[in-house]
Amino acid sequence: TVTGAWQHEGGGAFHNNGAIYRWDKTLIEGLDVLDPTTRMLDMSRIGRVLTGERSELGDGPPVTALFIQNQNPVQVAPEQRLVKAGFARDDLFACVHEQFMTATARMADVVLPATMFLEHDDLYQGGGHQYIQLGPKLIEPPGECRSNHDVVSALARRVGARHAGFDM
């Protein structure tokens, strides 16, 4: 972003300094129920994943459904030609939970309205510092907007999953 490349397709950055914290996220991330056999796919290689490159699929079948929050891969992921081709597949179902009609949301089959940071309680790990901050809800969300936590918890319950973190 120093060069202003974020303004151009494929010029975004993936960044997280969360590893500096010793925060037990077992409850909020469901770490106690993770299945170690679940394949992990590299979001920075989403174009190759969605176009079915075998080396990127982790010995699993092609991806046929996506649920996307807090990302805009159609705009910022590398290898834009592959990303757009992957999202354009007829056999791919994409649900995007988003605040704005981003490039990724425009390619989704379903777009769910998301809250903004002032519309739900949250805790924040620092970006560029080492503090944890409380972000209290200050205003009501408009219309049918829901927080990431509310949507994920509701979806999990709908498919029969149970976890104490869903009730937070």
Where does each model-flagged region fall?
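Generic secondary-structure signature for well-ordered alpha-helical cores
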Residues: 1-8, 116, 137, 157-164
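Extended redox/cofactor-interaction regions of prokaryotic respiratory oxidoreductases
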Residues: 2-106, 115-123
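N-terminal leader/propeptide and maturation segments of large enzyme subunits in energy/redox metabolism
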Residues: 67, 138-168
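Catalytic, metal-anchored helix/loop core of enzyme active sites in primary metabolism
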Residues: 109
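Glycine/threonine-rich phosphate-binding loop and adjacent beta-strand/alpha-helix elements that clamp
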Residues: 118-141, 152, 156
